[in-house]
């Protein structure tokens, strides 16, 4: 009896093992049969999640990015053309023509300055002011500006003119393949206004020619172009912020309008302290909501 009692669990155990093995084989077989379906379901689930994530963030901003690249290329193409006219006048010794072409040529650059700043040394090579870099490395527009307005001569500027044009053409070549995304655009818009606040509205940028308002206007235009490309996405997420930014761009441009002079702008020296104060106030009023655009867009 004891023997039978002792052997019964062994039989049960053996039977259990056998049944378990069969069960495992069936489960494995079922798993193998279900794997393609499960994989398909998992893939569909992942794709659905990705689509939902993209919908949650609003957009991948491809249209806006493509639009900004096209805008940048258009501006840089014209920048190269106008810079060549300017440098030709410098090399020809035509002081008056060189002075008249200086500020208009720079506007094309100032509108897309975030692009140049993203390309290493190109921005300081083209746009560094006296004191921004070592004296031996100073070149670009402001080096020539000093000679034209302070020294009243084009002498000794031929090499600087050639190098400036070469740098402009290099900028054009590099923009074709550079990475541009919504983050660069949003950051760039804010940086353009920071540029205005730190140097243009103070009259420090064009310390010899006093053509700061050209740069001021171009920076604002560049920032507005970025906003225009992203405003539909922004409005979908925060209608009030979108309207606030639009209104404050309008207010700033209205404040700047009286200083237009034909196709250009009056000398910065003609601005009164009250004029500078109003421009600064309108600039600050725009900068604050514009700085929130990136967070709302999720970039």
How would you label these PLM feature ranges?
Residues 46-299:
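Mature extracytoplasmic or organellar-lumen-exposed domains after removal of signal/transit peptides
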Residues 2-3, 30, 41, 105:
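Generic cytosolic/nucleocytoplasmic N-terminal low-complexity/intrinsically disordered segments
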Residues 1-9:
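Bacterial N-terminal signal peptides that target proteins for export
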Residues 8, 18-49:
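Bacterial lipoprotein signal-peptidase II cleavage site
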């Amino acid at each position: 009896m004891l023997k039978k009692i002792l052997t019964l669990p062994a039989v049960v155990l053996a039977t259990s093992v056998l049944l378990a093995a069969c069960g495992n084989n069936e489960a494995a077989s079922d798993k193998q049969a279900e794997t393609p379906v499960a994989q398909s379901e998992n893939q569909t689930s992942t794709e659905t999640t990705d689509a939902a994530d993209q919908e949650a963030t609003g957009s991948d901003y491809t249209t806006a990015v493509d639009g900004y690249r096209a805008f940048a290329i258009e501006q840089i193409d014209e920048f190269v053309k106008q810079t060549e006219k300017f440098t030709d006048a410098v090399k020809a010794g035509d002081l008056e023509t060189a002075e008249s072409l200086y500020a208009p040529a720079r506007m094309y650059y100032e509108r897309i300055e975030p692009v140049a700043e993203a390309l290493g040394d190109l921005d300081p090579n083209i746009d560094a002011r006296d004191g921004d870099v070592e004296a031996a490395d100073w070149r670009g527009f402001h080096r020539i500006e000093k000679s034209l307005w302070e020294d009243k001569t084009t002498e000794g500027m031929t090499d600087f003119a050639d190098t400036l044009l070469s740098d402009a053409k290099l900028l054009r070549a590099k923009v074709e393949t550079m990475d541009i995304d919504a983050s660069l655009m949003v950051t760039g818009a804010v940086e353009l206004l920071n540029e205005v606040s730190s140097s243009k509205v103070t009259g420090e940028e064009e310390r010899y020619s006093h053509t700061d308002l050209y740069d001021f206007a171009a920076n604002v235009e560049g920032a507005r172009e970025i906003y225009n490309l992203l405003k539909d996405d922004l409005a979908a997420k925060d209608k009030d912020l979108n309207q606030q930014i639009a209104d404050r761009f309008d207010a700033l441009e209205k404040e700047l309008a009286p200083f237009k002079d034909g196709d250009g702008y009056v000398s910065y020296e003609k601005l009164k302290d009250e004029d500078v104060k109003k421009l600064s106030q309108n600039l600050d009023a725009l900068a604050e909501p514009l700085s929130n655009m990136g967070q709302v867009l999720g970039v």
